[in-house]
Amino acid sequence: KEFYDELNQETINLLWDDTNRLYTIKEQVAYPFKNEWVEYEAWLSSVSDNNINTNKSVNDFISVLFKDNNHPFNHRGQYYKITLDGEHEETYICYDKMNVLSQTSDFKVVRCNQTLRWVDKTNGDIIEMPCYIGYDLSSTNNQYAKDGAIPNARLIIYVQANEQTMNIEINQRFMFMHKQCYKVEQVEDYETDQFCDNPTMVKLYIAYSPLLAVDNAELNLCDYYS
């Protein structure tokens, strides 16, 4: 086993610079998650599998490969900072972590295309957390009604599990783009990660909610005046 592990690492070392997919990215220090970052070189490529479809932007999903096959295992919900165009640094969240049975240190991330903002009920502080919002297809088939075909899709949010997000409740509301509101219908915050006793990522199922008088569109906050 050690022989093949070394051979695999030597092959990667030999080919590492022979690509135009080489980037320097920042990995969040974990676990526990901290607002500290470590830079690593990585190969980046687009994810192409059955889960990426017309309801999702392919550009948002990235496969990451680190050079060191013994890179410390990461976690779902761990954040990464990536600058694809050389100018705009964006935050990504890991949704498919490294596999202990894999011969390489590779995993998948998705771009955080929104920010969760809400008011902490205990102290009134405004909390902000990068997140991904998109559609989770429950079936590959459409539902058919008299008005036409309806996709079996639900809006979901992926966000890191931490002290703040683990307190998100059903019926809690969030605003995006200073006008669009959604309420939480289901919270999945109980799945522990491999080699970690605590949940590392929260998955929220959300549904449309109208803008209410207690909301502050200017601050992009729901239930601000409640």
Predicted regions and their residues:
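N-terminal disorder-to-order initiation segments that are Gly/Lys/Arg-biased
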Residues: 1-70, 94-155, 198-226
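Short coil-to-beta transition motif at edge beta-strands of beta-rich domains
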Residues: 22-27, 70-84, 163-177
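Short beta-strand-centered aromatic/proline hotspots
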Residues: 42, 75-99, 173, 179-193
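Intrinsically disordered, low-complexity segments enriched in Gly and acidic/Ser/Thr residues
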Residues: 140-187, 195-199
